[in-house]
Amino acid sequence: MAVSAVPHPSKQAQASEEGINQEKCINEEYKIWKKNSPFLYDLIITRALEWPCMSLQWYPEQQIFAEHGYTEQKMFLGVRADVGKYLLAVASIQLPYLNQTVPPTTMEGASAGDESSLRVNISNLYSHPESVCSAKLMPQDDSCVATVGNYHNDVLVFDKESFESYSSASESPLKPKYRLTKHTQPCTSVCWNFLSKGTLVSGSQDATLSCWDLNAYNESDSASVLKVHISSHEKQVSDVRFHYKHQDLLASVSYDQYLHVHDIRRPDASTKPARSVHAHSGPIHSVAFNPHNDFILATCSTDKTIALWDLRNLNQRLHTLEGHEDIVTKISFSPHEEPILASTSADRRTLVWDLSRIGEDQPAEEAQDGPPELLFMHGGHTSCTIDMDWCPNYNWTMATAAEDNILQIWTPSRSIWGNEQLEEDATAYLS
């Protein structure tokens, strides 16, 4: 019998029909979500970008225009403009001024409803020399950004001079201040140190991590910035994160299903993690430390779950969050509320979890909608969510970007999260 890579015609027809049915289902779900969104959100902004957004991050500062009833926030984006063409962009986003009495606002495209003049504008575009899968602003100096991409092995660092000297009239891309070279395969993630200015870590498909110190840069010796090169994983490193309160601690996760915690002060740091745990039954995609708690971190995986861990005892998982129907791609703790965690997935959903509700009694009819700790489900995207970020200046406000070029900024309704008990129970999940 001949073996063919081409599906049988009947199978092709079946697959085509299934695809059409799935698209219809997605469209129906979106219509239901859009109809109900005024009751679910205090704010929802939808902006169709010209290109897919591969990476997004809010700037920490804001400008307040109280007399006009809005503030202007900025967001840094990494986008794929075309085949072989990549851009970095700055978006200016107007959000309702918090001291104003602003009704729930739904915005489609670049403008809001009848009363609002709020806008989302792309204010700056910069040609990037390589692909961009992650772009991160330095916490101590947001004019400095580090980027990594799917098709090149280096970490590129751009400073204020890089952006100021850029000419949009020229066909030349941005010139990096530093090109950090060590990895032998494309990088997947990058993270700045929150306490040590100029220190960053990168993870790569070559199964290694590199920790860099830009303060040690020597023009005659480019390798001088490499602080430590870590070879502890067996497969692709998918995410890396520095601890918020300990500058020498960082975590890495990999397709080898392991979570590693590294102390870069150790003499054997280059080959052996300080802590290691087989964390999931499938490749791990993201890791996140809790910025409010020294010991809590989370991981997420292809196995559709999110795992909670305590650094003091990684031998035992604290809890498993189950609610996604596909690969969980990214997780992030709220910068404002200790027990709040958000997760994105290939199932097109962004879930918001309240860890203080773990173990609460739940009526049977509510259990059908998910566990008690599942606080909110954002269903505004019709394709896989690529990236997300909490707004640093607005509590409970997030930005999410999907494969279909849609950028959304949203705040769940206060009726959902405005629970006085939340603050009292902020650390209940640790007990």
Swiss-Prot record:
Cited InterPro entries: G-protein_beta_WD-40_rep (IPR020472), Histone-bd_RBBP4-like_N (IPR022052), WD40/YVTN_repeat-like_dom_sf (IPR015943), WD40_repeat_CS (IPR019775), WD40_repeat_dom_sf (IPR036322), WD40_rpt (IPR001680), WD_repeat_RBAP46/RBAP48/MSI1 (IPR050459)
Keyword Cell inner membrane: no
GO BP terms in the entry: chromatin remodeling; regulation of DNA-templated transcription; transcription initiation-coupled chromatin remodeling
SUPFAM superfamilies associated with the record: WD40 repeat-like (SSF50978)
MF GO annotations: H3-H4 histone complex chaperone activity; histone binding
Binding partners and assembly: Heterotetramer of alp13, clr6, prw1 and pst2.
Designated name of the protein: RbAp48-related WD40 repeat-containing protein prw1
Species this protein is from: Schizosaccharomyces pombe (strain 972 / ATCC 24843)
